[in-house]
Amino acid sequence: MDLSGNEKSRPWKKANVSSSTISDIQMTNGENLESGSPTRTEVLSPRLDDGSVDSSSSLYSGSEHGNQAEIQKELSALFSNMSLPGNDRRPDEYILVRQTGQDAFTGIAKGNLDHMPTKAEFNACCRLYRDGAGNYYPPPLAFDKISVPAQLEETWGMMEAKERNKLRFQYKLDVWNHAHADMGITGTEIFYQTDKNIKLDRNYKLRPEDRYVQTERYGRREIQKRYQHELQAGSLLPDIMIKTPKNDIHFVYRFAGDNYANKQFSEFEHTVKRRYGGETEIKLKSKSGIMHDSKYLESWERGSADIRFAEFVGENRAHNRQFPTATVNMGQQPDGQGGLTRDRHVSVEFLMQSAPNSPWAQALKKGELWDRVQLLARDGNRYLSPHRLEYSDPEHFTELMNRVGLPASMGRQSHAASIKFEKFDAQAAVIVINGPELRDIHDLSPENLQNVSTKDVIVADRNENGQRTGTYTSVAEYERLQLRLPADAAGVLGEAADKYSRDFVRPEPASRPISDSRRIYESRPRSQSVNSF
């Protein structure tokens, strides 16, 4: 393969180093693709030939001939045991990924390179940089993670934003170049340029039709940015990267109906580690292009590796699949005694089917009552307002609204902030699923409450400032994420607010994929991060 367009590429990997797209982790019941043999590294001990120095030279002639042998012996011992510069660096500190065909990629870790790539070869690949937790970042994301010392930010604080951004970029670029020199990488292109032909929506995000890259055999994959150089920027990487203890690299795609359909990530992990060894690392690609280590994901959010594994093929890991996809709150009505009825969120689909000509159904079809509508997020564990879901997940919003018969215009409605928060505060703190509706927990009889589990209960969320957000989240999701319950919801449930969060230990910050090795501004030593990476 001609990497640069001008020079012919050579094999990069050492003899017998395994590197493939699918390896022998079977995703189908068909042909089993055999991987290469394990890595074998030859150790060459440099030595001087006795005849390499002219014994007749006047410098070593006569009585000094004995000294010549001693010098040769000393030099031979010195060279044989002398460490190379940078020998203490990780052999997997970077991985080079080339595309070898449609949906086919080859990855080679630094330590398994057969020769030093040229500048053009480095820049023709997707370079993946390892951080302290075992995650791998493509160039634009690694560059973005470079931190600027607080004292510099403070110095620049009074400058115009344009000048401040310029200085910040120059600092990062200096760190970037020094780090690459330390790693021995001569190709230093960042590939941060986005495709100017792709227009953004009114929220400065990709439009739904531009949020995906298409594979030939495995369907489409969602991305967050459209780069000019999609390969080098990491947008085209397969779903899963496997790195063996010998630093062999394998890539795997998931697809509908594969051998792990509706199975947990743990089953896939068990298969991989049984094949390659218990220290094998599994990286799962994010929508941004970061290859996140599965253990890192689990250290932050329990079950998140399995959720991402499922998302590759559109599988859902909702705690309760009985939640209505859209509801309308028919409560908050005058109760005849000077007060208001409690919240009663009825399934929109149920309403449209059972009472399509009712005033409520007709009003919803016109786009009215939008501030009483709640929509189930893609993950099936949260309810959001139409406006919020349209902003955060426009594709899911459009599909859901079409399915339940609600106009998309609801997503473009919003109240003034004061009215919005007033309405949020009036909402029930705890709601429970009850057939085709969600009821304020106070409406359920003691007998019914006995049959309620955490999967049936959702609570009104609050932000860091204690304000209601207008969203509802499953209590089972609070438990999975080890989040602190809102105080009012905890009180209604009769639980401690820290029931799920008290045992959560925040992982140590991982060292960044690119950092200033000169440590001019930051000399604080870092402790080991997740999994001692």
Swiss-Prot record:
This protein's UniProt keywords: Crown gall tumor, DNA-binding, Host nucleus, Plasmid, Secreted, Virulence
Basic and acidic residues: bias regions: 1-10, 515-525
Biased composition (Low complexity): 53-63
Compartments where located: Secreted; Host nucleus
Region described as Disordered: 1-67, 504-533
Pfam family, one: VirE2
GO molecular function, one term: DNA binding
GO terms for cellular component: extracellular region; host cell nucleus
Ranges of compositional bias, category Polar residues: 16-42
GO biological process, one term: DNA-mediated transformation
Coiled coil (residue ranges): none
Induction: Targeted to degradation by the host proteasome by VBF and Agrobacterium virF in SCF(VBF) and SCF(COI1) E3 ubiquitin ligase complexes after mediating T-DNA translocation to the nucleus.
Primary role: Involved in DNA transformation; mediates the nuclear uptake of single-stranded DNA copies of the transferred DNA (T-DNA) element. Binds single-stranded but not double-stranded DNA regardless of nucleotide sequence composition.
Subunit structure: Forms heterodimers with the chaperone protein virE1 that prevent virE2 anarchic homopolymerization. Interacts with A.thaliana VIP1 that mediates its translocation to the host nucleus, and with host (e.g. A.thaliana and N.benthamiana) VIP2 that promotes T-DNA integration into the host genome. Forms a complex made of VirE2, host VIP1 and VIP2, and single-stranded DNA (ssDNA). Forms a complex made of virE2 and host (e.g. A.thaliana) proteins VIP1 and VBF.
Protein name per UniProt: Single-strand DNA-binding protein
Organism, scientific name: Rhizobium radiobacter (Agrobacterium tumefaciens)
Highest classification ranks of the organism: Bacteria, Pseudomonadati, Pseudomonadota, Alphaproteobacteria, Hyphomicrobiales
